[in-house]
Amino acid sequence: MANFPASLLILNGKSADNQPLREAITLLRDEGIQIHVRVTWEKGDAQRYVDEARRLGVETVIAGGGDGTINEVSTALIQIRDGVAPALGLLPLGTANDFATSAGIPEALDKALKLAIAGNAMEIDMARVNDKTCFINMATGGFGTRITTETPEKLKAALGGVSYLIHGLMRMDTLTPDRCEIRGENFHWQGDALVIGIGNGRQAGGGQQLCPTALVNDGLLQLRIFTGEELLPALFSTLTQSDDNPNIIDGASAWFDIHAPHEITFNLDGEPLSGQEFHIEVLPGALRCRLPPDCPLLR
Protein backbone atom coordinates (compact mmCIF):
# COMPACT_ATOMS: atom_id res chain seq x y z
CA MET A 1 0.00 0.00 0.00
CA ALA A 2 3.03 2.26 -0.12
CA ASN A 3 1.78 4.09 -3.22
CA PHE A 4 -1.34 5.44 -1.55
CA PRO A 5 -1.45 9.15 -0.66
CA ALA A 6 -1.33 10.46 2.87
CA SER A 7 -4.38 10.44 5.15
CA LEU A 8 -5.32 12.31 8.30
CA LEU A 9 -7.18 10.43 11.03
CA ILE A 10 -9.43 12.55 13.25
CA LEU A 11 -9.81 10.41 16.34
CA ASN A 12 -12.46 10.91 19.01
CA GLY A 13 -10.68 11.54 22.30
CA LYS A 14 -12.48 8.61 23.95
CA SER A 15 -10.52 6.24 21.66
CA ALA A 16 -7.11 7.84 22.10
CA ASP A 17 -5.83 4.94 24.23
CA ASN A 18 -7.05 2.21 21.84
CA GLN A 19 -4.04 -0.10 21.73
CA PRO A 20 -5.19 -2.28 18.76
CA LEU A 21 -5.66 0.93 16.75
CA ARG A 22 -2.15 2.10 17.63
CA GLU A 23 -0.79 -1.23 16.45
CA ALA A 24 -2.79 -1.12 13.20
CA ILE A 25 -1.51 2.38 12.42
CA THR A 26 2.06 1.38 13.23
CA LEU A 27 1.86 -1.59 10.85
CA LEU A 28 0.59 0.60 8.01
CA ARG A 29 3.26 3.21 8.67
CA ASP A 30 5.85 0.44 8.51
CA GLU A 31 4.49 -0.36 5.04
CA GLY A 32 5.20 3.21 3.99
CA ILE A 33 1.72 4.70 4.43
CA GLN A 34 1.69 8.24 5.78
CA ILE A 35 -1.04 8.65 8.39
CA HIS A 36 -1.39 11.84 10.42
CA VAL A 37 -3.35 11.45 13.68
CA ARG A 38 -5.22 14.21 15.48
CA VAL A 39 -7.34 13.72 18.62
CA THR A 40 -10.49 15.74 19.34
CA TRP A 41 -11.02 17.29 22.74
CA GLU A 42 -13.94 19.69 22.23
CA LYS A 43 -16.52 20.77 19.68
CA GLY A 44 -14.91 22.52 16.73
CA ASP A 45 -11.75 20.40 16.72
CA ALA A 46 -12.92 18.41 13.68
CA GLN A 47 -13.32 21.60 11.63
CA ARG A 48 -9.82 22.78 12.58
CA TYR A 49 -8.31 19.40 11.71
CA VAL A 50 -10.07 19.33 8.33
CA ASP A 51 -8.55 22.74 7.63
CA GLU A 52 -5.15 21.33 8.59
CA ALA A 53 -5.73 18.30 6.36
CA ARG A 54 -6.14 20.61 3.39
CA ARG A 55 -2.89 22.40 4.21
CA LEU A 56 -1.14 19.03 4.44
CA GLY A 57 -2.57 18.01 1.07
CA VAL A 58 -3.97 14.67 2.21
CA GLU A 59 -6.48 12.90 -0.02
CA THR A 60 -8.50 11.29 2.79
CA VAL A 61 -9.76 12.47 6.15
CA ILE A 62 -10.70 9.49 8.32
CA ALA A 63 -13.37 9.88 11.01
CA GLY A 64 -12.41 7.63 13.91
CA GLY A 65 -15.33 7.38 16.32
CA GLY A 66 -19.09 6.94 16.30
CA ASP A 67 -21.86 8.61 14.32
CA GLY A 68 -21.26 11.95 16.03
CA THR A 69 -17.62 12.03 14.96
CA ILE A 70 -18.54 11.05 11.40
CA ASN A 71 -21.12 13.85 11.40
CA GLU A 72 -18.63 16.47 12.56
CA VAL A 73 -15.99 15.47 10.03
CA SER A 74 -18.39 15.15 7.09
CA THR A 75 -20.03 18.48 7.93
CA ALA A 76 -16.61 20.14 7.90
CA LEU A 77 -15.73 18.51 4.57
CA ILE A 78 -18.83 19.79 2.76
CA GLN A 79 -17.99 23.35 3.79
CA ILE A 80 -15.01 23.26 1.40
CA ARG A 81 -15.92 25.31 -1.64
CA ASP A 82 -12.58 25.93 -3.37
CA GLY A 83 -10.85 22.95 -4.93
CA VAL A 84 -11.49 19.26 -4.39
CA ALA A 85 -12.26 18.26 -0.81
CA PRO A 86 -10.54 15.19 0.66
CA ALA A 87 -12.58 12.00 0.67
CA LEU A 88 -14.14 10.74 3.90
CA GLY A 89 -12.92 7.49 5.42
CA LEU A 90 -14.81 5.66 8.17
CA LEU A 91 -13.24 3.99 11.20
CA PRO A 92 -16.06 2.80 13.52
CA LEU A 93 -15.05 3.24 17.16
CA GLY A 94 -18.25 4.48 18.81
CA THR A 95 -20.98 2.87 20.91
CA ALA A 96 -23.42 2.11 18.11
CA ASN A 97 -21.63 2.90 14.80
CA ASP A 98 -24.96 2.90 12.99
CA PHE A 99 -23.84 4.53 9.75
CA ALA A 100 -20.64 2.50 9.40
CA THR A 101 -22.49 -0.74 10.18
CA SER A 102 -25.21 -0.16 7.59
CA ALA A 103 -22.54 0.83 5.05
CA GLY A 104 -20.77 -2.51 5.50
CA ILE A 105 -17.56 -1.12 7.01
CA PRO A 106 -15.49 -4.02 8.46
CA GLU A 107 -15.47 -4.35 12.23
CA ALA A 108 -11.80 -5.36 12.28
CA LEU A 109 -9.76 -2.19 12.78
CA ASP A 110 -6.99 -3.10 10.36
CA LYS A 111 -9.45 -3.90 7.56
CA ALA A 112 -11.53 -0.79 8.21
CA LEU A 113 -8.39 1.35 8.22
CA LYS A 114 -7.18 -0.08 4.92
CA LEU A 115 -10.60 0.53 3.35
CA ALA A 116 -10.62 4.10 4.68
CA ILE A 117 -7.26 4.74 3.01
CA ALA A 118 -7.49 2.75 -0.21
CA GLY A 119 -11.20 2.18 -0.91
CA ASN A 120 -13.01 3.67 -3.88
CA ALA A 121 -14.31 7.18 -3.19
CA MET A 122 -18.02 7.32 -4.06
CA GLU A 123 -20.16 10.44 -4.16
CA ILE A 124 -22.82 10.29 -1.45
CA ASP A 125 -25.62 12.52 -0.21
CA MET A 126 -25.97 14.37 3.06
CA ALA A 127 -28.97 16.15 4.57
CA ARG A 128 -29.45 19.60 6.03
CA VAL A 129 -31.98 20.83 8.59
CA ASN A 130 -33.29 24.40 8.62
CA ASP A 131 -30.47 25.49 6.27
CA LYS A 132 -27.97 25.05 9.08
CA THR A 133 -27.41 21.68 10.78
CA CYS A 134 -26.37 18.65 8.73
CA PHE A 135 -26.57 14.90 9.19
CA ILE A 136 -25.08 12.03 7.21
CA ASN A 137 -27.02 9.15 8.76
CA MET A 138 -30.43 9.93 10.21
CA ALA A 139 -32.70 12.38 11.96
CA THR A 140 -34.83 10.68 14.60
CA GLY A 141 -37.64 12.18 16.61
CA GLY A 142 -40.06 11.07 19.28
CA PHE A 143 -39.61 8.59 22.11
CA GLY A 144 -36.58 7.00 20.42
CA THR A 145 -34.76 10.33 20.43
CA ARG A 146 -35.39 10.87 24.12
CA ILE A 147 -33.99 7.42 24.87
CA THR A 148 -30.79 7.85 22.85
CA THR A 149 -30.09 11.22 24.46
CA GLU A 150 -30.93 10.08 28.00
CA THR A 151 -29.20 6.68 28.08
CA PRO A 152 -26.38 6.86 30.67
CA GLU A 153 -22.83 6.83 29.29
CA LYS A 154 -21.81 3.98 31.62
CA LEU A 155 -24.67 1.83 30.34
CA LYS A 156 -23.71 2.54 26.73
CA ALA A 157 -20.08 1.71 27.42
CA ALA A 158 -20.98 -1.59 29.07
CA LEU A 159 -23.70 -2.85 26.73
CA GLY A 160 -23.28 -0.97 23.46
CA GLY A 161 -26.33 -0.51 21.22
CA VAL A 162 -28.62 -2.77 23.28
CA SER A 163 -28.31 -0.23 26.11
CA TYR A 164 -30.76 2.05 24.28
CA LEU A 165 -33.43 -0.68 24.26
CA ILE A 166 -32.90 -1.54 27.93
CA HIS A 167 -33.09 2.10 28.97
CA GLY A 168 -36.21 2.56 26.85
CA LEU A 169 -38.02 -0.28 28.58
CA MET A 170 -37.02 1.23 31.92
CA ARG A 171 -38.66 4.52 30.88
CA MET A 172 -42.04 3.16 29.78
CA ASP A 173 -43.74 5.49 32.26
CA THR A 174 -42.69 8.52 30.19
CA LEU A 175 -43.88 7.10 26.87
CA THR A 176 -45.86 9.81 25.05
CA PRO A 177 -46.26 10.44 21.30
CA ASP A 178 -45.56 13.70 19.46
CA ARG A 179 -48.41 15.28 17.49
CA CYS A 180 -47.11 16.72 14.23
CA GLU A 181 -47.74 17.30 10.52
CA ILE A 182 -45.24 16.12 7.90
CA ARG A 183 -45.19 17.13 4.23
CA GLY A 184 -42.93 16.05 1.38
CA GLU A 185 -43.04 15.46 -2.36
CA ASN A 186 -46.37 13.65 -2.90
CA PHE A 187 -46.55 13.01 0.84
CA HIS A 188 -48.74 14.37 3.62
CA TRP A 189 -49.41 12.92 7.06
CA GLN A 190 -50.77 14.31 10.30
CA GLY A 191 -51.17 12.53 13.62
CA ASP A 192 -49.43 11.19 16.72
CA ALA A 193 -45.93 9.86 16.11
CA LEU A 194 -44.19 7.60 18.57
CA VAL A 195 -40.99 7.50 16.50
CA ILE A 196 -39.96 9.46 13.39
CA GLY A 197 -36.97 8.44 11.30
CA ILE A 198 -35.74 10.46 8.31
CA GLY A 199 -32.84 8.57 6.87
CA ASN A 200 -29.99 9.06 4.49
CA GLY A 201 -28.68 5.90 6.16
CA ARG A 202 -30.74 2.98 7.41
CA GLN A 203 -30.35 2.49 11.15
CA ALA A 204 -30.09 4.47 14.37
CA GLY A 205 -30.28 4.00 18.12
CA GLY A 206 -27.84 1.10 18.24
CA GLY A 207 -29.04 -1.02 15.33
CA GLN A 208 -32.73 -0.20 14.88
CA GLN A 209 -33.52 -0.37 11.13
CA LEU A 210 -35.76 2.68 10.98
CA CYS A 211 -35.30 3.31 7.23
CA PRO A 212 -34.41 -0.13 5.82
CA THR A 213 -34.52 0.88 2.13
CA ALA A 214 -32.51 4.11 2.35
CA LEU A 215 -29.64 4.70 -0.08
CA VAL A 216 -26.91 7.31 0.24
CA ASN A 217 -26.64 8.16 -3.46
CA ASP A 218 -30.22 8.35 -4.74
CA GLY A 219 -30.97 12.01 -3.98
CA LEU A 220 -33.79 11.05 -1.62
CA LEU A 221 -34.50 10.84 2.08
CA GLN A 222 -36.51 7.92 3.44
CA LEU A 223 -39.18 8.56 6.05
CA ARG A 224 -40.65 6.10 8.51
CA ILE A 225 -43.23 7.00 11.13
CA PHE A 226 -44.37 4.71 13.93
CA THR A 227 -47.79 6.04 14.82
CA GLY A 228 -48.71 6.30 18.46
CA GLU A 229 -52.46 5.80 18.70
CA GLU A 230 -51.87 2.59 20.67
CA LEU A 231 -48.63 3.14 22.51
CA LEU A 232 -47.63 -0.32 23.66
CA PRO A 233 -48.36 -2.13 20.36
CA ALA A 234 -46.57 0.66 18.50
CA LEU A 235 -43.49 0.27 20.68
CA PHE A 236 -43.29 -3.45 20.06
CA SER A 237 -43.84 -2.78 16.36
CA THR A 238 -40.80 -0.55 16.50
CA LEU A 239 -38.77 -3.44 17.87
CA THR A 240 -40.13 -6.22 15.63
CA GLN A 241 -40.29 -4.26 12.33
CA SER A 242 -43.04 -6.40 10.80
CA ASP A 243 -43.67 -5.66 7.11
CA ASP A 244 -47.47 -5.50 7.34
CA ASN A 245 -47.68 -3.33 10.43
CA PRO A 246 -50.55 -0.80 10.38
CA ASN A 247 -48.63 1.46 12.77
CA ILE A 248 -45.87 2.09 10.19
CA ILE A 249 -46.07 4.94 7.64
CA ASP A 250 -43.37 5.16 4.94
CA GLY A 251 -42.43 7.90 2.50
CA ALA A 252 -39.59 9.14 0.30
CA SER A 253 -38.79 12.68 -0.81
CA ALA A 254 -35.91 15.07 -1.48
CA TRP A 255 -37.29 17.19 1.37
CA PHE A 256 -39.66 17.05 4.31
CA ASP A 257 -41.33 19.84 6.27
CA ILE A 258 -42.39 19.08 9.83
CA HIS A 259 -44.67 21.22 11.97
CA ALA A 260 -45.60 20.53 15.60
CA PRO A 261 -47.88 22.54 17.92
CA HIS A 262 -45.37 22.01 20.72
CA GLU A 263 -41.59 21.73 20.86
CA ILE A 264 -40.17 18.40 19.73
CA THR A 265 -36.57 17.21 19.58
CA PHE A 266 -34.78 15.55 16.70
CA ASN A 267 -31.52 13.69 17.11
CA LEU A 268 -29.19 14.40 14.15
CA ASP A 269 -26.44 11.76 14.26
CA GLY A 270 -26.38 12.20 18.02
CA GLU A 271 -26.81 15.98 18.13
CA PRO A 272 -30.18 17.16 19.54
CA LEU A 273 -32.13 19.92 17.80
CA SER A 274 -35.38 21.21 19.28
CA GLY A 275 -38.13 23.31 17.74
CA GLN A 276 -41.61 23.34 16.24
CA GLU A 277 -40.68 23.80 12.55
CA PHE A 278 -38.16 21.70 10.63
CA HIS A 279 -37.21 21.81 6.95
CA ILE A 280 -35.07 18.81 6.07
CA GLU A 281 -33.54 18.55 2.59
CA VAL A 282 -31.12 16.21 0.86
CA LEU A 283 -27.78 17.52 -0.46
CA PRO A 284 -27.10 15.24 -3.46
CA GLY A 285 -23.49 14.15 -3.98
CA ALA A 286 -22.31 16.43 -1.18
CA LEU A 287 -19.08 14.56 -0.46
CA ARG A 288 -16.97 11.57 -1.45
CA CYS A 289 -16.74 8.61 0.90
CA ARG A 290 -14.55 5.50 0.71
CA LEU A 291 -16.97 2.57 0.83
CA PRO A 292 -16.74 -1.17 0.17
CA PRO A 293 -17.65 -2.27 -3.38
CA ASP A 294 -20.65 -4.24 -2.07
CA CYS A 295 -21.91 -1.41 0.16
CA PRO A 296 -25.66 -1.99 0.76
CA LEU A 297 -26.31 1.76 0.85
CA LEU A 298 -25.34 2.29 -2.81
CA ARG A 299 -27.84 1.85 -5.61
From Swiss-Prot:
Binds 1 Mg(2+) ion per subunit. Ca(2+) may be able to substitute. The active site is at 271 (proton acceptor). InterPro entries: ATP-NAD_kinase_N, Diacylglycerol/lipid_kinase, Diacylglycerol_kinase_cat_dom, Lip_kinase_YegS, Lipid_Phosphate_FormReg, NAD/diacylglycerol_kinase_sf, YegS/DAGK_C. Pfam families: DAGK_cat (PF00781), YegS_C (PF19279). Its EC number is 2.7.1.-. It is found in: Cytoplasm. Probably phosphorylates lipids; the in vivo substrate is unknown. This is Probable lipid kinase YegS.
